[in-house]
Swiss-Prot record:
Pfam families referenced in this protein's UniProt entry, alphabetically: 2-oxoacid_dh (PF00198), Biotin_lipoyl (PF00364), E3_binding (PF02817)
Domain Peripheral subunit-binding (PSBD): 128-165
GO molecular function ontology, one term from the record: dihydrolipoyllysine-residue acetyltransferase activity
Name of the protein described by the UniProt record: Dihydrolipoyllysine-residue acetyltransferase component of pyruvate dehydrogenase complex
Superkingdom of origin: Bacteria
GO biological process: pyruvate decarboxylation to acetyl-CoA
Source organism of this protein record: Rickettsia prowazekii (strain Madrid E)
Lineage: Bacteria, Pseudomonadati, Pseudomonadota, Alphaproteobacteria, Rickettsiales
Stretches assigned to the Lipoyl-binding domain: 2-78
Length: 408
């Protein structure tokens, strides 16, 4: 009897995903536990393993398909020598989702046709324009009915469009040929990022606090630790590792900053789980260092390296990037001095970390050169007030400027 292969739900909140690639083709033998496809979720590309043994009789949803609903039929397994008519009958009975999608597409096509007919009906006064004039008008977003034609019988020509463009400086348009850019379809990750960031800026009352941190002691301690592990290529502590640990220790001291908003109540988290923004090819992902306050700098560094590699390879599992109570975004390696990051909802805080640069400062009434790092906290004012945010930043500064406090 044929066996259904359904679109899996790779996380509790997943409703649809992209079927990125089939690793098996129709007619191939499939064994239990064998990877047969790759599914693209909102944060990573996940492998789909077969539960049963059989022949991949039919691929219903082709690769590179977007917005495939969870639990929809994507393929069918059959036993060796199973009758094709039985397989076709099985697909017809179980492929209601595909039929529904086709019906929706048909309705959309019909509606588009109706819209086009209505558009033609209202266009009672035909406008005469040369093909080049029409092309220039389209590129420059100029309505032809607003242009006075100078050609035979009022025909709009190239010069009319160019004259219209230069006649009013406030409406001056720079023409760009459509061949000067390339269009890249938005993948599922990009769409989710866009949706969440827009929602965050529109619904969360952001406010920002900045502070300068002297990281000279931290750089010295980091150098000493790395020298002691010079033979161990895996253990190489980064500045970002210290930043993660300092945030974790500060959240432990100021637990009111480790919170999120819900309509019924503010949730204060018992665990200190830190999300760290990692740039990947298709956007950004935030793997989580769980219980970061309970880890030493070596453990934290090794775990972070593993998470970054998995993120770059699109191999993160949902449990490794869903959740978290606080996010760190570090753009210092790009020379960015400071920036205001957008809160990663439903979290209430994100800290933007800038570059460490040599600056002149006053210490004991003397001007000295120090390595200064700017950090900016973006906070949700529904959850965290200014005093709590300031207390958190003061605690972070104390740990980052005195790294020994994090190591004891």
């Amino acid at each position: 009897m044929p066996i259904k292969i359904l679109m899996p739900a790779l996380s509790p909140t997943m409703r649809e995903g992209n079927l990125a690639r089939w690793l098996k083709k129709e007619g191939d033998k499939v064994n239990p536990g064998e990877v047969i496809a790759e599914i693209e979720t909102d944060k990573a590309t996940m492998e789909v393993e077969s539960v049963d043994e059989g022949i991949l009789a039919k691929i219903i949803i082709p690769q590179n398909s977007q917005n495939v609903p969870v639990n929809s039929l994507i393929a069918v397994l059959s036993e060796e020598g199973e009758d094709k008519a039985d397989i076709d009958s099985f697909i017809a009975q179980n492929n209601s989702v595909s039929l529904s999608l086709k019906t929706d597409a048909t309705l959309k096509k019909s509606n588009d046709s109706i819209t086009n007919v209505e558009g033609i009906k209202h266009d009672s006064n035909k406008i005469f324009a040369s093909p080049l004039a029409k092309r220039l008008a389209k590129i420059g977003d100029i309505r032809l009915e607003n242009v006075q034609g100078s050609g035979p019988h009022g025909r709009i020509v190239k010069q009319d469009i160019l004259s219209y463009d230069s006649s009013t400086s406030s409406n001056k348009i720079v023409y760009r040929d459509t061949e000067e850019y390339r269009s890249v379809p938005n993948n599922n990750i990009r769409k989710i990022i866009a949706k969440r960031l827009l929602e965050s800026k529109q619904t969360v009352p952001h406010f920002y606090l900045s502070i300068e941190c002297n990281v000279d002691k931290l750089l010295d301690v980091r150098e000493d630790i790395n020298k002691s592990f010079s033979e161990d290529k895996v253990t190489k502590i980064s500045v970002n590792d210290f930043i993660i640990l300092a945030v974790a220790k500060a959240l432990q001291e100021v637990p009111n900053a480790n919170a999120s908003w819900s309509e019924d109540a503010i949730r204060y988290y018992n665990n200190v789980d830190i999300s760290v923004a990692v740039a990947i090819e298709n956007g950004i992902v935030t793997p989580i260092v769980k219980d970061a306050n309970k880890k030493n700098i070596i453990e934290l560094s090794r775990e972070m390296k593993t998470l970054i590699k998995k993120a770059k390879d699109n191999k993160l599992t949902p449990i490794e990037f869903q959740g978290g109570g606080f996010t760190i975004s570090n753009l210092g390696m790009y020379g960015i001095k400071n920036f205001n990051a957008i809160i990663n909802t439903p979290q209430s805080c994100i800290m933007g970390v800038g570059a460490s640069t040599k600056r002149a400062i006053v210490k004991n009434d003397q001007i000295i050169i120090a390595t200064i790092m700017d950090v900016t906290l973006s906070a949700d004012h529904r959850v965290i007030d200014g005093a709590v945010s300031a207390e958190f930043l003061a605690s972070f500064k104390r740990f980052i400027e005195n790294p020994v406090l994090m190591l004891i």
